[in-house]
Curated annotation (Swiss-Prot):
Disulfide bonds: none annotated. Its main location: membrane. SUPFAM superfamilies: EF-hand (SSF47473), Protein kinase-like (PK-like) (SSF56112). Residues 41-56 have a biased composition (Low complexity). CDD domains: EFh, STKc_CAMK. A lipid is attached at G2 (N-myristoyl glycine). This is Calcium-dependent protein kinase 11. Residues 414-449, 450-485, 486-521, 522-555 form the EF-hand domain. The active site is at D237. Ca(2+) 1 binds at D427, D429, S431, H433, E438. The keyword DNA damage does not apply. May play a role in signal transduction pathways that involve calcium as a second messenger.
Length: 576
C-alpha cells in the first residue's frame, strides 16, 4: 500500500476552480495583485500588487486583519445574521473606463470566436458557447455587462478573479482561462468548456459508486485546496456545484470553477467578511475571524455528503443551519454510517473539527490513509439509499416558484389590493423592476430593520429568473398571502397552465417548456418531477401538484433548503 502524499509542488496534479458568477466587495486596503503573464504551470509566488484607487464604500467593509486576536464569540456575532451569499448591487453605470486596466488588444472577441448558443444565465453574466475560428475548438465565454459594475469594488472583484485564474494556470483540475476581452459594453472571459455536468449529477447518473470512488473525488477536491493554499489563494466558496466534469466520458477530469469569492492571503492573515454558502460555511466564518482553514471544513462537508447523501449540519432555515454549524453534533450512527469504513469517518471527523488550529491542513488531509493513492478506502458499493438522498439534496423545486408566478398574474385587482401601490412605491425610477438598492430603501421606509445579508436573501428568493431585479409578477408572487395561493380555483388554474395538453398530468416536456418560458436554465427536469412525483409514474398529477404547493409554503433557497423559515418579502414589507 503506497502513500502517495504530495507536497505543494506536486499538488498541481490533483485540483480544480474558475467561472465568474458572484463577487464580494473588497476593501480598499486589500488591493489585488497585478495580472501575471500567462503561464503553463502554477507560479510559486503571488503577483506583485498594483495600486487601485480606494473605493468610497470601502469604509463599510472590514474584511481582513493581521491581528491574530481572540475571535469574536458566537454570542456577539449571531449566526442568524450571517450572509449565506452576497449579491452585487445592480447598477446603471460603470465607474472605470477599462475593467481589465491594460491596453486592450485590438482584436475583438468576435474577430477570433464565433458566438453560439447560450449555456447559462447567472446573476451577473451570461455564458455562451464560442468556437475559435482558427481551430474550430469549443470554449465557454462569460460575458459580464459593464453597466452592472456600480462600485470600484465591483471592478476590482472582476480583476481579482481573472488574476487568480491566471495565477493558478496550468493546474490539471482548475478550469483554464483562455483569454479576457473588453469592449464598450462588456468584459468577456473565454474559458475551458466543461460539458460533463456537476459532481453530484454525475454520481446520480451513474447510479452506483463506492467508497473508493468517493475517496478519488475527495483526493481531487483536497488536492486543489492544497495547491491553492500553497500559492496564497483561499477559495472561500467550496461546494459541489463548483465542480464540473470536462466531458461525459468515464475518465473525464473534474475541474473546479468559480473564483468569485476567492482572495489572495498571506501567512497568518485573518479575514472577517462573511461569505460562502450555508451548508458548507465554516463556524469561524460565522464568527468573523478566519483563515485558509475554512476551505478544509467545506471539503469535509462535501465528503460527508458524498458518503451519506445528506449534509452534516441540517435545518429547515438558514438560521438553523448556521446554529447547527456552530453547535451541532456530527452524526455517524444513522444509516449508512455503520457500513462506512472507520478510516473515512476518521478523516471527516478531523476535517470538521471546529477549532481551526486543530483541524487537518489540506496537506495533512491529502496524506490521510483513506484519501491517498492505493489507500484503504474499500471498493464496496455504497448503499443505494445514499444515491436517493443525494438526488433529493441536489434537486431544487423550481416548479413551485413558477406556479406562484402564474397564480400571482391571474389575481384580480381586489385580490392584490395594496400590492400594486407597494410595487410602485419601491420602483422609484418607474422602470418596472425593483433593484436591490430600491428594495433596501423601501424596506427602510416601512421600518424594516434588516441586515444587508437578510435583504440579499429576500431578493434572491423573489428573483425567479435570476435577472438581478424583481419584476411586477415576481413581486406579487413573493408577497401573496398564502390563503390566496391555496384557493382551489387558483391551484387548478396554475396546474392547467403547465398541463398544456389537458391530459391531467404535467409531463417532462411540458415542464421543460415552462422552464424555458420563465428563463430558468441549467435545470434537471427529471429531478424536479422526481421530488414531487409520489407514485413514480414520471409525471405530476393534480393531487401531487396541490400537495407540493401546500407543503412548507416558504420560499425555497439554493440547494433546495428553505430560505429563512416563514419569513419572506411579505413579512419584511409588513404586508402579513
Amino acid at each position: 500500500m503506497g502513500n502517495n502524499c504530495v507536497g505543494p509542488s506536486a499538488a498541481g496534479q490533483n485540483g480544480f476552480f474558475a467561472n465568474v458568477a458572484l463577487w464580494r466587495p473588497r476593501p480598499a486596503d486589500a488591493a489585488p495583485p497585478a495580472l501575471p503573464p500567462p503561464s503553463s504551470a502554477p507560479s510559486d509566488q503571488a503577483p506583485e500588487p498594483v495600486t487601485i484607487p480606494p473605493s468610497e464604500h470601502s469604509s463599510h467593509h472590514s474584511s481582513r486583519s493581521t491581528d491574530p486576536s481572540t475571535p469574536t464569540s458566537a454570542a456577539e456575532q449571531p449566526a442568524n445574521k450571517a450572509a449565506p451569499k452576497v449579491k452585487r448591487v445592480q447598477s446603471a453605470g460603470l465607474l472605470a473606463d477599462s475593467v481589465l486596466k491594460r491596453d486592450v488588444n485590438t482584436a475583438r472577441l468576435k474577430d477570433l470566436y464565433t458566438i453560439g448558443k447560450k449555456l447559462g444565465q447567472g446573476q451577473f453574466g451570461t455564458t455562451y458557447l464560442c468556437v475559435e475560428k482558427a481551430t474550430g475548438r469549443e470554449f465557454a465565454c462569460k460575458s459580464i455587462a459593464k453597466r452592472k459594475l456600480l462600485t470600484q469594488e465591483d471592478v476590482e472583484d472582476v480583476r481579482r478573479e481573472i488574476q487568480i485564474m491566471h495565477h493558478l494556470a496550468g493546474h490539471a483540475n482548475v478550469v483554464s482561462i483562455v483569454g479576457a476581452y473588453e469592449d464598450a459594453v462588456a468584459v468577456q472571459l473565454v474559458m475551458e468548456l466543461c460539458a460533463g455536468g456537476e459532481l453530484f449529477d454525475r454520481i446520480i447518473q451513474r447510479g452506483h459508486y463506492s467508497e473508493k470512488a468517493a475517496a478519488q473525488l475527495a483526493r481531487v477536491i483536497v488536492g486543489v485546496i492544497e495547491a491553492c493554499h500553497s500559492l496564497g489563494v483561499m477559495h472561500r466558496d467550496l461546494k459541489p456545484e463548483n465542480f464540473l466534469f470536462i466531458h461525459q466520458k468515464e475518465d473525464s477530469p473534474l475541474k473546479a470553477i468559480d473564483f468569485g469569492l476567492s482572495i489572495f492571503f498571506k501567512p497568518g492573515e485573518t479575514f472577517t467578511d462573511v461569505v460562502g454558502s450555508p451548508y458548507y460555511v465554516a463556524p469561524e466564518v460565522l464568527m468573523k475571524h478566519y483563515g485558509r482553514e475554512v476551505d478544509v471544513w467545506s471539503a469535509g462537508v462535501i465528503i460527508y455528503i458524498l458518503l451519506s447523501g445528506v449534509p452534516p449540519f441540517w435545518d429547515e432555515s438558514e438560521q438553523g443551519i448556521f446554529e447547527q454549524v456552530l453547535k451541532g453534533d456530527l452524526d455517524f450512527s444513522s444509516e449508512p454510517w455503520p457500513n462506512i469504513s472507520e478510516s473515512a469517518k476518521d478523516l471527516v471527523r478531523k476535517m470538521l473539527i471546529r477549532d481551526p488550529k486543530k483541524r487537518l491542513t489540506a496537506h495533512e488531509a491529502l496524506c490521510h490513509p483513506w484519501v491517498c493513492v492505493d489507500g484503504v478506502a474499500p471498493d464496496k458499493p455504497l448503499d443505494s439509499a445514499v444515491l436517493s438522498r443525494l438526488k433529493q439534496f441536489s434537486a431544487m423545486n423550481k416548479l413551485k416558484k413558477m406556479a406562484l408566478r402564474v397564480i400571482a398574474e391571474s389575481l384580480s385587482e381586489e385580490e392584490i389590493a395594496g400590492l400594486k401601490e407597494m410595487f410602485k412605491m419601491l420602483d422609484t425610477d418607474n422602470s418596472g423592476h425593483i433593484t436591490l438598492e430600491e428594495l433596501k430603501t423601501g424596506l427602510q421606509r416601512v421600518g424594516a430593520n434588516l441586515m444587508d445579508s437578510e435583504i440579499d436573501a429576500l431578493m434572491e428568493a423573489a428573483d425567479i429568473d435570476n435577472s438581478g431585479t424583481i419584476d411586477y409578477g415576481e413581486f406579487i408572487a413573493a408577497t401573496l398571502h398564502i390563503n390566496k395561493v391555496e384557493k382551489e380555483d387558483k391551484l387548478f388554474a396554475a396546474f392547467s397552465y403547465f398541463d398544456k395538453d389537458g391530459s391531467g398530468y404535467i409531463t417532462q416536456d411540458e415542464l421543460q417548456k415552462a422552464c424555458e418560458e420563465f428563463g430558468i436554465g441549467d435545470t434537471r427536469i427529471e429531478d424536479i418531477i422526481g421530488d414531487i412525483d409520489q407514485d413514480n409514474d414520471g409525471r405530476i398529477d393534480y393531487n401531487e401538484f396541490v400537495e407540493m404547493m401546500q407543503k412548507g409554503n416558504n420560499a425555497m433557497g439554493k440547494m433546495g433548503q428553505h430560505s429563512t423559515g416563514n419569513f419572506g418579502l411579505g413579512e419584511a414589507l409588513k404586508l402579513r
